[in-house]
C-alpha cells in the first residue's frame, strides 16, 4: 500500500477543518514522535521488548521544533520471548535488578499511545510518524507489540518513519548516533548509551537540530497543498 493510499483511507484522524496548526502544516498532518527500544535480540517477532521510550516533538511560535514530553518504561518480557545473552551484555540491562520495576507490554504501550494521542490532538495532527535512529528496527518492535496485543488504536503510521541515521548522514556525514550528536554539538555520554530513555532523548535533540538547521538555511516554506 502506498503512503498516499494509506492517507486517503485514514483521513479524519486528527485535526478537522479550518487553518492548520503549524506542526500539522510542517509535516503534512503528521506528528514526529521519537522512539527507541532496547530488546532481547534483533527479531521483533520472537525477541523480548525490554525498554521503550518516546519523546513527543513540539513547535514554538517561530516554527522551530523541540523535544517536549518523554515517556519511558522498562518492560517485562512477553511469555515465551527469546532473550539473547549477547543482547543483555550489549545493553547492560539486568532483568533481575531489584530497582528495574518493569511493567507489562500492555501498560507500557497503552501509556505511551495515550500520551501520543494527546499530543496529536494538541497539534491538530492526524497520525504520528516514528522518528528513530535506524528507525525500521524500532518501528518493527512497536508493530510487533501492537500485533501481539491485538491493539486497535495504534497512533503511529505502520510503515512511514523519519530515520535520523539517514538525516545525520546527509547533514553531518555521520550515521552513528554518538558521532552524529558530537558533529551537531550535542553532548553525548557513551556510558549512558543503550538506555532507551537516554538514546531517545539524544535522538530527539538530533532530529530537532537537523530540522531547525534546515529551516534556518531557508530550506522549507509553508506551502499549502
UniProtKB/Swiss-Prot annotation:
Its EC number is 3.1.13.-. SUPFAM superfamilies: Ribonuclease H-like. Its cofactor is Mg(2+). GO terms for cellular component: cytosol. Binds two Mg(2+) per subunit. The active form of the enzyme binds two Mg(2+) ions in its active site. The first Mg(2+) forms only one salt bridge with the protein. It comes from the Bacteria. The record marks 42, 90, 137, 159 as: Important for substrate binding and specificity. One of its GO terms (biological process) is DNA replication proofreading. Keywords: Exonuclease, Hydrolase, Magnesium, Metal-binding, Nuclease, tRNA processing. Residues 33-207 form the Exonuclease domain. The active site is at 194 (proton donor/acceptor). InterPro entries: Exonuclease_RNaseT/DNA_pol3 (IPR013520), RNase_T (IPR005987), RNaseH-like_sf (IPR012337), RNaseH_sf (IPR036397). Belongs to the RNase T family. NCBIfam families: RNaseT (TIGR01298). HAMAP family: RNase_T. This is Ribonuclease T.
Amino acid at each position: 500500500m502506498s503512503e498516499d493510499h494509506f492517507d486517503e483511507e485514514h483521513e479524519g484522524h486528527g485535526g478537522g477543518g479550518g487553518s492548520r496548526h503549524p506542526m500539522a502544516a510542517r509535516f503534512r498532518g503528521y506528528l514526529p514522535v521519537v522512539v527507541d527500544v532496547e530488546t532481547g535480540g534483533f527479531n521483533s517477532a520472537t525477541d523480548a521488548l525490554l525498554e521503550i521510550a518516546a519523546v513527543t516533538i513540539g513547535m514554538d511560535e517561530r516554527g522551530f521544533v523541540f523535544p517536549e514530553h518523554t515517556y519511558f518504561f522498562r518492560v517485562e518480557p512477553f511469555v515465551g520471548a527469546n532473550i539473547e545473552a549477547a543482547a543483555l551484555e550489549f545493553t547492560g540491562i539486568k532483568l533481575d535488578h531489584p530497582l528495574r520495576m518493569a511493567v507489562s507490554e500492555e501498560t507500557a504501550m497503552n501509556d505511551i499511545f495515550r500520551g501520543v494521542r494527546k499530543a496529536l490532538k494538541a497539534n491538530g495532527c492526524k497520525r504520528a510518524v516514528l522518528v528513530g535512529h535506524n528507525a525500521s528496527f524500532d518501528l518493527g518492535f512497536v508493530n510487533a507489540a501492537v500485533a501481539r496485543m491485538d491493539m486497535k488504536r495504534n497512533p503511529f503510521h505502520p510503515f512511514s518513519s523519519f530515520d535520523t541515521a539517514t538525516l545525520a548522514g546527509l547533514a553531518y556525514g555521520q550515521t552513528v548516533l554518538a558521532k552524529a550528536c558530537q558533529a551537531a554539538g550535542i553532548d553525548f555520554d557513551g556510558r549512558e548509551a543503550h538506555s532507551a530513555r537516554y538514546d531517545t532523548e539524544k535522538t530527539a535533540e538530533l532530529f530537532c537540530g537537523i530540522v531547525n538547521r534546515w529551516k534556518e538555511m531557508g530550506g522549507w516554506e509553508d506551502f499549502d497543498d
